[in-house]
């Protein structure tokens, strides 16, 4: 049976959304929103959307046939059947107001994802950190095994050139977003929880117990025959395990993990480890990603694939040939500066634990290099709530260029901005950070900072990613030695 024939057979088994033909996305330029929109375009729905700025997501959707408007206006929703809204959109948005007046259904992003998942074999990946990489690894393993899954990922899967794709099988692999508790809409067959930490606490009223209970509720959305795959190394996940009334598969470096990593080593961008599973022979693996945290992400993929009886040969090949995800320890090239060659890496991590894991991976893979980090804090509330943790982790690099906070729409908070954080790190005494008042100034400062052999790491979830790519394209203002292919 050809892929086309398989897809036709699959579509005959999945009911279309009754009366819904025209779907409009408010905030379509986000990775999660754009990914769902792409799947719906490919399913044959008439998709439109709006956002405040053009980006690579909107450009791709336009090429696929979606109608994209830059800017929000009431006229954008006049002829649609349903409006999908992202978390970033508030109730005063003119398109939301117009949709309410026209009695057009308004659904959250996760509700639309849940509809896509409802008649498929869903695999949902949740957790404070590692969701995007874990989802990408699972999608890659399933693809290598010939399962041809549909996937919706919060980052660019480099091998596919996109963050979403409509497959021809019954599998749907997707990130599950806990930031607004909307992952409770999902009803997958397999759920993964990578870890649980205090983040997005405004959603949970500042109550960490409520956050933990919400993760338990997410796992209980599984059917009684479903599988919960959880990281036993995480202390909070271990704590809630007795409350989970579903079949559990654990993974980690811990001796009591069902899927355990042993003999870890890292050389440059790659890791080697042995995986031990109950009832199976040990398997020696090469992972084309750096860091112990990424081995944990790979273990989650191994656990899911093993439960689904995917052949080990697909695991071995998918992990060894994994081409990475955009902005997840992404090597952008090597450049010659007046003082010598430097290496440029870009990473999305913006929580202290994520930044610490990235630093650890960089130290393990390139111990001889001086680590220069250009860090852009993301959200004033996160900077305020995790202030001391940020001071601790950012003090671990050799040279720190600290940008101001990327607000993500939040109002400034006194004492939780880049200048305050810079002062606090300096007072700690380990490091003398350089404050970068405007992103445009970063390129001006680099010539005085960079030395031969440095690893320059641009870090954060804001527009520092675009800035990093601009630095790569302009070769840091110096000469190119070796430049990786840089996706837009």
UniProtKB/Swiss-Prot annotation:
Keywords: ATP-binding, Cell cycle, Cell division, Cell shape, Cell wall biogenesis/degradation, Cytoplasm, Ligase, Nucleotide-binding, Peptidoglycan synthesis. It comes from the Bacteria. InterPro entries: Mur-like_cat_sf, Mur_ligase_C, Mur_ligase_C_dom_sf, Mur_ligase_cen, Mur_ligase_N, MurCDEF_pg_biosynth, UDP-N-AcMur_Ala_ligase_MurC. Its main location: cytoplasm. Cell wall formation. NCBIfam families: murC. This is UDP-N-acetylmuramate--L-alanine ligase. It comes from Shewanella sp. (strain W3-18-1).
């Amino acid at each position: 049976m050809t892929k086309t024939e398989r897809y036709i057979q699959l579509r005959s088994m999945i009911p279309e959304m009754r009366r819904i033909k025209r779907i409009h996305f408010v905030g379509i330029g986000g990775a999660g929103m754009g990914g769902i929109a792409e799947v719906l375009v490919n399913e044959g729905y008439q998709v439109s959307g709006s956002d405040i700025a053009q980006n690579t997501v909107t450009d791709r959707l336009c090429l696929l046939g979606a109608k994209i408007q830059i800017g929000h206006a009431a006229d954008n929703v006049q002829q649609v059947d349903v409006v999908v809204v992202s978390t970033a959109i508030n109730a005063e948005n003119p398109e939301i107001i117009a949709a309410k007046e026209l009695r057009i259904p308004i659904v959250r992003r996760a509700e639309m994802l849940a509809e896509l998942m409802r008649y498929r074999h869903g695999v949902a990946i949740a957790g404070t950190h590692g969701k995007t990489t874990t989802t990408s690894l699972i999608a890659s393993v399933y693809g290598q095994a010939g399962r041809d899954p549909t996937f919706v990922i919060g980052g660019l899967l480099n091998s596919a050139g996109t963050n979403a794709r409509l497959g021809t099988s019954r599998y749907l692999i997707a990130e599950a977003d806990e930031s607004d508790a909307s992952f409770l809409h999902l009803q997958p067959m397999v759920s993964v929880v990578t870890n649980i930490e205090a983040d997005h606490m405004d959603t949970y009223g500042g109550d960490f117990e409520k956050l933990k209970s919400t993760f338990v509720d997410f796992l209980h959305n599984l059917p009684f025959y479903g599988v919960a795959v959880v990281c036993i190394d995480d202390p909070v996940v271990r704590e809630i395990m007795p409350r989970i009334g579903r079949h559990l598969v654990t993974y980690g470096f811990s001796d009591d993990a069902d899927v355990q990593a042993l003999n870890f080593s890292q050389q440059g961008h790659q890791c080697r480890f042995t995986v031990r599973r109950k009832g199976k022979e040990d398997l020696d693996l090469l992972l084309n990603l750096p860091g112990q945290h990424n081995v944990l992400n790979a273990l989650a993929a191994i656990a899911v694939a093993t439960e689904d009886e995917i052949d080990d040969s697909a695991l071995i090949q998918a992990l060894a040939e994994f081409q990475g995800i955009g902005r997840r320890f992404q090597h952008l090239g090597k450049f010659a500066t007046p003082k010598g060659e430097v290496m440029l890496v870009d990473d999305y991590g913006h929580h202290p634990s994520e930044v610490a894991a990235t630093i650890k991976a960089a130290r393990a893979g390139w111990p001889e290099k001086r680590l220069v980090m250009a860090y852009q804090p993301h959200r004033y509330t996160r900077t305020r709530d995790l202030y001391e943790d940020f001071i601790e982790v950012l003090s671990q690099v050799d040279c720190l260029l600290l940008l101001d906070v990327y607000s993500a729409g939040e109002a400034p908070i006194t004492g939780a901005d880049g200048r305050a954080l810079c002062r606090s790190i300096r007072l700690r005494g380990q490091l003398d950070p350089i404050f970068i008042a405007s992103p445009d100034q970063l390129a001006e400062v680099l010539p005085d900072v960079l030395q031969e052999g440095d690893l320059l790491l641009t870090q954060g979830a804001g527009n520092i990613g675009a800035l990093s790519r601009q630095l790569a394209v302009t070769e840091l203002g110096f000469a190119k030695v070796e430049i990786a292919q840089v996706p837009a």
